[in-house]
Amino acid sequence: MNLTPREKDKLLISMAAMVARRRLERGVKLNHPEAIALITDFVVEGARDGRSVAELMEAGAHVLTRDQVMEGIAEMIHDIQIEATFPDGTKLVTVHEPIR
């Protein structure tokens, strides 16, 4: 299987998001990379499902709460910028203050 660097990145994010979901199910608080991966995966999959940029910007800020991440993680992440493929092309989605 020959994957482009972008496809490899998408696959890595998807796998990290799966690990993060399993940890949340067990009640384990997420670290920085896990939180980023989970929110990124949510936006990428939402774009694939046909949701709008504005909708994903808003919804992406409600994927995780402060109680679901390790102490200090919410303060470390001010914005997440995700390049996602929508039905009408690739767009940049910025989620402001994603962990509230």
From Swiss-Prot:
<comment type="similarity">
    <text>Belongs to the urease gamma subunit family.</text>
</comment>
<dbReference type="InterPro" id="IPR002026">
    <property type="entry name" value="Urease_gamma/gamma-beta_su"/>
</dbReference>
<dbReference type="InterPro" id="IPR050069">
    <property type="entry name" value="Urease_subunit"/>
</dbReference>
<dbReference type="InterPro" id="IPR036463">
    <property type="entry name" value="Urease_gamma_sf"/>
</dbReference>
<protein>
    <recommendedName>
        <fullName>Urease subunit gamma</fullName>
        <ecNumber>3.5.1.5</ecNumber>
    </recommendedName>
</protein>
<dbReference type="GO" id="GO:0009039">
    <property type="term" value="F:urease activity"/>
</dbReference>
<dbReference type="GO" id="GO:0043419">
    <property type="term" value="P:urea catabolic process"/>
</dbReference>
<keyword id="KW-0963">Cytoplasm</keyword>
<dbReference type="GO" id="GO:0016151">
    <property type="term" value="F:nickel cation binding"/>
</dbReference>
<dbReference type="GO" id="GO:0005737">
    <property type="term" value="C:cytoplasm"/>
</dbReference>
<comment type="subunit">
    <text>Heterotrimer of UreA (gamma), UreB (beta) and UreC (alpha) subunits. Three heterotrimers associate to form the active enzyme.</text>
</comment>
<dbReference type="InterPro" id="IPR012010">
    <property type="entry name" value="Urease_gamma"/>
</dbReference>
<keyword id="KW-0378">Hydrolase</keyword>
<dbReference type="Pfam" id="PF00547">
    <property type="entry name" value="Urease_gamma"/>
</dbReference>
<comment type="pathway">
    <text>Nitrogen metabolism; urea degradation; CO(2) and NH(3) from urea (urease route): step 1/1.</text>
</comment>
